[in-house]
UniProtKB/Swiss-Prot annotation:
Signal peptide: none annotated. GO terms for molecular function: toxin activity. Coiled coil: none annotated. Its main location: secreted. One of its GO terms (cellular component) is extracellular region. Belongs to the cationic peptide 04 (cupiennin) family. 02 subfamily. Expressed by the venom gland. Keywords: Amidation, Secreted, Toxin. The keyword Secreted applies. This is Cupiennin-2e. The modification Glutamic acid 1-amide is found at residue 35. It is found in: Secreted. It comes from the Eukaryota.
Length: 35
């Protein structure tokens, strides 16, 4: 069950990253949040 949750979160994160990547400076903000 835990594995399926991780997979779901990974898919959501991937979609969010793609959307943010289209906006200037969004990837920089994303890196700041990960740190």
């Amino acid at each position: 069950a835990f594995g399926t949750i991780l997979k779901a979160l990974a898919k959501i994160a991937a979609k969010a990253v793609k959307k943010l990547a289209t906006k200037p400076g969004a990837t920089y903000m994303l890196k700041q949040n990960l740190e």
